Curated annotation (Swiss-Prot):
Glycosylation sites: 93, 238
Gene that produces this protein: plyA
Protein name stated in the entry: Probable pectate lyase A
Keywords from the UniProt entry: Calcium, Carbohydrate metabolism, Cell wall biogenesis/degradation, Glycoprotein, Lyase, Metal-binding, Polysaccharide degradation, Secreted, Signal
Catalytically driven reaction(s): Eliminative cleavage of (1->4)-alpha-D-galacturonan to give oligosaccharides with 4-deoxy-alpha-D-galact-4-enuronosyl groups at their non-reducing ends
Pfam families the UniProt entry points to: Pectate_lyase_4
Role: Pectinolytic enzyme consist of four classes of enzymes: pectin lyase, polygalacturonase, pectin methylesterase and rhamnogalacturonase. Among pectinolytic enzymes, pectin lyase is the most important in depolymerization of pectin, since it cleaves internal glycosidic bonds of highly methylated pectins. Favors pectate, the anion, over pectin, the methyl ester.
Active site per UniProt: 220
Any Gene Ontology CC annotation: extracellular region
The species this protein was found in: Aspergillus fumigatus (strain CBS 144.89 / FGSC A1163 / CEA10)
Major localisation: secreted
Length: 321
């Protein structure tokens, strides 16, 4: 794997960008690294089912049964599983890992609700109808790491035919979404579901987006309300409305490249952003100036000119277990 995000113990706070500059060649070691980074590394860290039971599943029934409890467990998905159904509820202390690129859930998604300490890695989730929920939904939960997933639908239908790809709502906290391929969708990723939910969401919704490849997206790449976001080392290709900061959200946007976007970074209803070393590809940054200049963990930046070569072909479901 050819991206980087330096991992630091969860107790660090207020660090400047002291980590060494990343190189494309240095990114390969992360493929086998099981430690969460970004906001998911804080608040005690995110270890998923490490140290628990191990199960391999290849059917909808077996998958649903395997992931539901709160006991420590690692659930490997072998091959595709297709089922038109509501989201499968995922228990705490769970790692869901696709064994290779054939591990794709089609027609149903995952719901992490009122849970903690969950890892979802190397998994495909696609074409989940709106009536069945998001591809990956995180609600009222903390310490969730979504890494190397491939989430998509299509844009052949209207914008309400599918729901979100990765939505973080209802005061969820300490979430990292990394190294993922997020593509072919109308409304991709939402942090904070409603302008009217500030009382619940304020002080929560801390989310890191790192090393992601966004492609053929209409909007919400991502959209953030009330919370705190850090978006870095990501490549945005043909994303109409990119990063939307709104309703008091504070977002730090660094080392990203945009190609074919009309609105790369913008505010709605007093959302704020600080941006550094971003190539907006001719699109405008119209976001209000924010105050988030540091985050309480260490990380390394590729530089906007190197993001495409490091992320495209590496982000997504590219690992093997």
């Amino acid at each position: 794997m050819k991206f980087v995000a330096t991992l630091i113990a969860c107790g660090l706070s207020g660090l400047a960008l002291a980590a060494p500059t990343a190189t494309v060649d240095s990114l390969g070691k992360r493929a086998a690294d099981d430690a969460a980074f970004g906001y998911a590394s804080l608040n005690g860290g995110t270890t998923g089912g490490a140290g628990g039971t191990t199960t391999t599943v290849s059917s909808y029934a077996a998958f649903t049964a395997a992931v539901s409890s709160d006991a420590k467990k690692v659930v490997y998905v072998s091959g595709p599983i297709k089922q038109s159904a509501k989201q499968v509820k995922v228990g705490s202390n769970t790692s869901i890992i696709g064994k290779d690129s054939t591990a794709v859930l089609e027609g149903f998604g995952l719901l992490v609700k009122e849970k903690s300490n969950v890892i979802i890695r190397n998994l495909g989730v696609k074409k989940v109808l709106a009536e069945n929920g998001d591809a990956i939904g995180i609600q009222y939960s903390n310490n969730v790491w979504v890494d190397h997933v491939d989430v998509s639908s299509d844009r052949d239908h209207d914008k309400d035919y599918y729901d979100g790809l990765i939505d973080v709502t209802h005061a969820a906290d300490y979430v990292t979404i990394s190294n993922s391929y997020i593509h072919d969708h109308w409304k991709a990723s939402l942090v904070g579901h409603s302008d009217n939910n500030g009382d619940e969401d304020k002080g929560h919704l801390r989310v890191t987006y790192a090393n992601n490849y966004w492609s053929n997206i209409n909007s919400r790449a991502p959209s953030l309300r009330f919370g705190t976001g850090h978006i870095y080392n990501s490549y945005f290709e043909n994303v109409s409305d990119g990063i939307n900061t709104r309703d008091g959200a504070q977002v730090l946007v660094e080392s990203n490249q945009f190609v074919g976007s009309s609105k790369a970074l913008y505010s709605t209803d007093d959302g704020y952003a600080v941006e550094r070393d971003n190539d907006f590809g001719g699109a405008k940054n119209t976001a209000l100036q924010g105050t988030l200049t540091t985050v309480p963990y260490s990380y390394s930046l590729l530089g906007s000119s190197k993001v495409k070569s490091a992320v495209v072909g590496v982000a997504g479901q590219t690992l093997k277990f």
